[in-house]
Amino acid sequence: MEDMLLYDRLQFAFTITFHYIFPQLTMGLSLLIVYFKWKYLRTKIEKYNKAAIFWMKIFAVNFTMGVVTGIPMEFQFGTNWAKFSELTGGIIGQTLAMEGTFSFFLESSFIILFIFGEKLLGHKLHFLAGFLVFLGSWLSGWFIIATNAWMQNPVGFEILENGRYVLDNFWELFSNPWLIFAFLHNQMASLITSSFVVASVGALYILLKKDIEYGKLFLKTGVVFGLFASILVIFPTGDWNAKKMHDYHPASFAAMEGLFKTENNAELVILGQPNMDEQTLDNKIAIPGFLSFLTYHRFDDNIKGMDAFPKEELPTNVPMLYYSYHIMVGLGTVFIAVMLLAFYYLYRNNLFDKKGLLWVIMLLAPFAYIANLLGWYVAELGRQP
């Protein structure tokens, strides 16, 4: 039985990991497409219009792959978690249905109009079509994260005598504190991925001395949006999410921070390897008191460690949760450093000559995908109840 449960989890983890490669690009890319089209309306410079159409074609391919990989994921709710689907379908079925009804049709309809309907629509309606694709993309994220937020922090429901969960407060479901903070964090993370992809394509064009005009446009746009998103994904949205994890899932919070013992003046671990046998961190590098400060804005406050919780309430794989969180934070720090340096050179008007930095930006794009996936691993590996 335990083996079958593990296999079900591994199968679902593989399916949803592969699926999320695609939405994390489309959600952020839709905003950049709207920006390019808006810039064209303001300046009438044709390169912005062509950039918008070019990236919408990339969006369409990723959107299609997202749909194809998302269908088996929904099937696996029934095949792998049949009892969960039976009992909670009255709630999660509604949010998933709204995602399909509102978001999917909004995106799929206006993608075609944007790619092929420029001459028919005129530029203002063409911009509106792009904006509606963006709206559908972000609404899709909202409904999916609403589903996940209910699983993280169940609200707005009652349990019937037959054990079924039914929704009794629609607005409470969509004002779930977990939903609001997770959505903002997720969208900034998606914008990081799309910004690095756009910037990396621009860097590649410049390095190859091909389509230099568009290479400079893509690189400049990716750097500006990437720096903005890289900062916001850590503060305030990442800070908000960590505090919500502490409030709602304190055992998972202790595990991801590598805090084995309850402490006043709790330290923030930078590096270290969890030793589950000894219940400690090996080769630890930490900042004293800083975890208490980030959590409560006071250095001497108490943070519960894993020793404060029964073993059955702890995440099943503490090292994986710990490493996922710390690698994600480490990559986020690298993103800020690289984008800040690139923005500095952009301000100095010599970014396009920095070949070493262009190589770094180009090669970092896959790591933006990895950081996004690790963020979801952190959310799901420690999820309660």
Model segments located where?
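Polytopic transmembrane helical bundles with strong interfacial aromatic enrichment
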Residues: 1-385
